[in-house]
Amino acid sequence: MTVTGIIAEFNPFHNGHKYLLETAEGLKIIAMSGNFMQRGEPALIDKWIRSEMALKNGADIVVELPFFVSVQSADYFAQGAIDILCQLGIQQLAFGTEDVIDYQKLIKVYEKKSKQMTAYLSTLEDTLSYPQKTQKMWEIFAGVKFSGQTPNHILGLSYAKASAGKHIQLCPIKRQGAAYHSKDKNHLLASASAIRQHLNDWDFISHSVPNAGLLINNPHMSWDHYFSFLKYQILNHSDLTSIFQVNDELASRIKKAIKVSQNIDHLVDTVATKRYTKARVRRILTYILVNAKEPTLPKGIHILGFTSKGQAHLKKLKKSRPLITRIGAETWDEMTQKADSIYQLGHQDIPEQSFGRIPIIIKNERLN
């Protein structure tokens, strides 16, 4: 049987994700962000609820991306996720994209020219953000064009780069329905942005989200729940440069900006520059929130849930792979577990996120 990997956030899970799972082949293993997202935001609903939604709609196994993989720039996010999926025996990687191009060809380009491409990045002016530099790199070396509204396509290029030398097949699937950032409700396949924007419209949610009750009946989290914690961390931290990726310039800008900022958007807008994108600033603020220092990655793979079919695959891997099914006396990743504790502080109804939790098991693989 073909084993297909999918890298996801499911923030939240919606009909577009269900379409991706239905279109992908074989046994589907999801490497999913935990309780903090790649662009530096707390998850709308917790990782266990999102895992359950995925398993009820086509996923066979859901594993958790460690904090220092989840909350990273696209290249590191892709590299960390693909490394984990390869340990789980995937043969191909499926992903949604605005532009279906020959990503396999791009893998070959990077395998042949990685040194030249990396060297080229270092020649570009520092006024450009890293995403702008990588876009120029792909344009020069592979002739890839960018429309400016293709976040999944850009992530697909990071998947191509991370897949070099891995012997896996990239399987792009054309994104259906609303655009990534669209807030339009008039789509059967509405975007995650639209769903987050219209959470109080239950009729819209029930049509846009499979198993909508899991979304409707659980706490909805945002930066608003954590801004006071962040403000405390910034104002009381003696040396922000000890936090991952915070340099002297950013430390100064953040310390000044927090004194006049009433919410996360104001703070991000004040700190961000051409060089420091809003996404990067949000990630750095997340690092400050959870007091993240130099990154270390766990050796084990944390299993959030599986179906009967997924369980059979995991049994084959158990003796040769460090699979973690319960965090207790046996710890998994200190940084992720600390981030989970802070996430839980945001709402009294969020249950324990790490210790003692066991994988979600769906006996019938296609419960809709």
Curated annotation (Swiss-Prot):
Gene3D superfamilies linked: HUPs
PANTHER family: TRNA(MET) CYTIDINE ACETATE LIGASE
Gene Ontology MF term list: ATP binding; ligase activity, forming carbon-nitrogen bonds; tRNA binding
Official protein name in the record: tRNA(Met) cytidine acetate ligase
UniProt organism field: Streptococcus pyogenes serotype M2 (strain MGAS10270)
EC number(s) from the headed UniProt entry: 6.3.4.-
Keyword Nucleus carried by entry: no
Catalytic reaction(s) noted: cytidine(34) in elongator tRNA(Met) + acetate + ATP = N(4)-acetylcytidine(34) in elongator tRNA(Met) + AMP + diphosphate
Chain sites annotated for binding ATP: 7-20, 96, 152, 175
Domain of life, per lineage: Bacteria
Catalytic EC class: ligase
HAMAP family, alphabetized: TmcAL
InterPro entries membership: Rossmann-like_a/b/a_fold, tRNA(Met)_cyd_acetate_ligase
One of the GO biological process terms: tRNA modification
UniProt KW Ubl conjugation keyword: no
Gene Ontology CC annotation, any one: cytoplasm
Function: Catalyzes the formation of N(4)-acetylcytidine (ac(4)C) at the wobble position of elongator tRNA(Met), using acetate and ATP as substrates. First activates an acetate ion to form acetyladenylate (Ac-AMP) and then transfers the acetyl group to tRNA to form ac(4)C34.
Keyword set, alphabetical order: ATP-binding, Cytoplasm, Ligase, Nucleotide-binding, RNA-binding, tRNA processing, tRNA-binding
Location in or out of the cell: Cytoplasm
Matching SUPFAM superfamilies: Nucleotidylyl transferase (SSF52374)
A family per Pfam: HIGH_NTase1
Assigned protein family: Belongs to the TmcAL family.
